[in-house]
From Swiss-Prot:
This is SEC14-like protein 2. The keyword Hydrolase does not apply. One of its GO terms (molecular function) is phospholipid binding. The keyword Cytoplasm applies.
């Protein structure tokens, strides 16, 4: 049995009745605690009454703390309204709202430099509530329960800039919030136009997703427009995505409904860095350098680094070793990222590199040009691995061609 209204086993019916009894003290604090609502929490915890109750009570506290009942009337800051990409547009064949997430033009670093993380998370909460409100409108309009949403995840233009650690961490916080407070609301998620980098990006966010959510993610290949139209009527899909819907002025992207983001002008910036915690600290003597080595076992892995120096600039470059088991000078190795000096004492430096070859990569902090000052450098380096399942899926689909 699916655990949904009208499809409950005797054990599930008994669990529902007991669950309602156990949480009756908090039901008045919830917008519409009908059987559909309660079953979402039970399904999310496999009908474990104790875990379901703990999850729901935590959600009630979340609603109080974040003032969720009034969040739709809250207006996000101007920079978020103008540049946070995505939007609700159309309905699938079952009448469920469709949400578009547009990744490529999203300026994640600009958003975190221009708005507080709390305002960004609050905006995502507001979007969740707007989608649930739309589900309620559809329920009234169609005369049958609508309680889930379809998401189209447009990954065209997904690049290394989107792997910036503070942005991934902020997105992870949102995913945790979604999993904990909006269980069983995702019907399916279509990933379209996924580039070769997608398996690495997906592997970064996968830990924040429940197993059930992961099963609802469908990575589509070159025929993605045809697949979408099997689930959504053409008149409910923008021309940009293979349908016939346009804005009243004929715009094929339906920009009145979907925000396509873009680079954020620096006039919006309220900070030029995001506070970081670094894993390592090293003192580099004058006229010296410091090397850290990372083994890359197969192509497609991504090196991600962040560093800051105290008091003065420092050189940085990446090299590939030509001899194993011994320290090599920069001139003896293959240069991968040219060495240059960075003002990381003023603004922390960060970057990513897709490793096209396996081998030992050396990240070299250079202070050889300084004859007077030693440098203290704080840094974090990570090797980001691709998700093998999605990588294989993309190979099968031939979906790894877009750059």
């Amino acid at each position: 049995m699916s655990g949904r209204v009208g499809d409950l086993s005797p054990r599930q019916k008994e669990a529902l009745a007991k669950f309602r009894e156990n949480v009756q003290d908090v039901l008045p604090a919830l917008p519409n605690p009908d059987d559909y609502f309660l079953l979402r929490w039970l399904r999310a915890r496999s009908f474990d009454l104790q875990k379901s109750e703990a999850m729901l009570r935590k959600h009630v506290e979340f609603r109080k703390q974040k003032d969720i009942d009034n969040i739709i009337s809250w207006q996000p800051p101007e920079v978020i309204q103008q540049y946070l990409s995505g939007g609700m547009c159309g309905y699938d064949l079952d009448g469920c709202p469709v949400w578009y997430d547009i990744i490529g033009p999203l300026d994640a670093k600009g958003l975190l430099f221009s708005a507080s993380k709390q305002d960004l998370l609050r905006t995502k909460m507001r979007e969740c509530e707007l989608l649930l409100q739309e589900c309620a409108h559809q329920t009234t309009k169609l005369g049958r329960k609508v309680e889930t949403i379809t998401i189209i995840y447009d990954c065209e233009g997904l690049g290394l800039k989107h792997l910036w650690k503070p942005a991934v961490e902020a997105y992870g916080e949102f995913l945790c919030m979604f999993e904990e407070n909006y269980p069983e609301t995702l019907k399916r998620l279509f990933v379209v136009k996924a580039p070769k980098l997608f398996p690495v990006a997906y592997n970064l966010i996968k830990p924040f997703l429940s197993e059930d959510t992961r099963k609802k993610i469908m990575v589509l290949g070159a025929n993605w427009k045809e697949v979408l139209l099997k689930h959504i009527s053409p008149d409910q899909v923008p021309v940009e995505y293979g349908g016939t819907m346009t804005d009243p002025d004929g715009n094929p992207k339906c920009k009145s409904k979907i925000n396509y983001g873009g680079d954020i002008p620096r006039k919006y910036y309220v900070r030029d860095q995001v506070k970081q915690q670094y894993e390592h600290s090293v003192q580099i003597s004058r006229g010296s350098s410091h090397q850290v080595e990372y083994e890359i076992l197969f192509p497609g892995c991504v090196l991600r680094w962040q560093f800051m120096s105290d008091g003065a600039d420092v050189g940085f470059g990446i090299f590939l070793k030509t001899k194993m088991g011994e320290r090599q000078r920069a001139g003896e190795m293959t240069e991968v990222l040219p060495n240059q000096r960075y003002n990381s004492h003023l603004v922390p430096e960060d970057g990513t590199l897709t490793c096209s070859d396996p081998g030992i990569y050396v990240l070299r902090f250079d202070n050889t040009y300084s004859f007077i000052h030693a440098k203290k450098v704080n840094f974090t380096v990570e090797v980001l691995l691709p998700d093998k399942a999605s990588e294989e899926k993309m190979k099968q689909l031939g979906a790894g061609t877009p750059k």
